[in-house]
Regions:
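FIC/Doc superfamily catalytic core
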Residues: 1-244
Length: 244
């Protein structure tokens, strides 16, 4: 599968129009819309694209969520151009922007945190398959993950890139730093990394959400996430085949 991905990637990148602003805007909008739907939200594509093109949300909660996702990605684009390191402050800033208009203060048995400020969750969070990281360990686990990923990407070629970002996404979702929007935050972060390294955006299709969630549940934290890596490769092959 990796060789198919590399072959299609090269064919896609050699197309004359892939570097045009029109095509880049199209890919960006597709990426954001699929990410929005993966987060469990839904809007007609025309309304979503109108929010992105005008920068103006409507009065509903769903359109505000779309606007916030768009603003969070704009922030990622600007920081990628500045070569912003992947660190705790940046991760929190991305999450805060995603939750800016729909987040708020949450109270648990151990304290309060504000999702609109990018606060880390307080309190245990258990999934039906595996327990997620102890909330007291979130800063250390996430800091180590960010540092490791940054170092690995500076030394990686195209062949290793997908494995590295898949590992980041997998461990990020097992740490589950935030009370909400972890999936959207994780997807924006791996694409921030791709943008910074001048790789094509990773398009994960909402129609394959069940497969994505299943891939994220395979194994334990810090294990090599082969299932997720294969899923991301499959999604990119699917995208390239659509475009070539």
């Amino acid at each position: 599968m990796l060789q198919d991905y590399l072959t299609l990637r090269q064919a896609y990148l050699t197309r004359p129009d892939t570097r045009t602003q029109i095509h880049q805007n199209y890919v960006r909008n597709l990426f954001l819309y699929e990410t929005f739907r993966l987060g469990g939200h839904n809007l007609p594509p025309t309304i979503f694209e109108n929010i992105v093109s005008t920068g103006k949300p409507q009065s509903t909660e769903t359109t505000r969520q779309a606007y916030d996702l768009w603003q969070a990605w704009q922030y990622c684009e600007k920081q990628a151009a500045l070569r912003q390191p992947l660190d705790l402050s940046f991760v929190r800033a991305v999450s805060a922007r995603i939750m800016k208009h729909t987040g708020g203060e949450t109270t648990t048995s151990v304290g309060r945190y504000d999702t609109s400020l990018g606060d880390f969750r307080l309190g245990e969070d258990y999934d039906e398959v595996y327990p997620l990281a102890d909330f007291r360990k979130i800063p250390l686990l996430l800091d180590n993950l960010c540092r490791t990923t940054e170092v690995q990407l500076t030394e990686a070629g195209v062949s290793e890139n997908i494995k590295i970002v898949a590992t980041f996404m997998y461990d990020f979702m097992h740490i589950k730093p935030f009370g909400y929007c972890n999936l959207e935050t994780g997807i924006l972060l791996i694409n921030f990394l791709e943008l910074k390294e001048e790789h094509p955006l990773l398009i994960l299709f909402a129609d394959d959400r069940a497969e994505l969630l299943n891939a994220l549940k395979q194994g334990k934290i810090s294990e090599t996430p082969e299932t997720l890596e294969a899923f991301i490769l499959h999604e990119q092959i699917k995208f390239f085949n659509r475009e070539i």
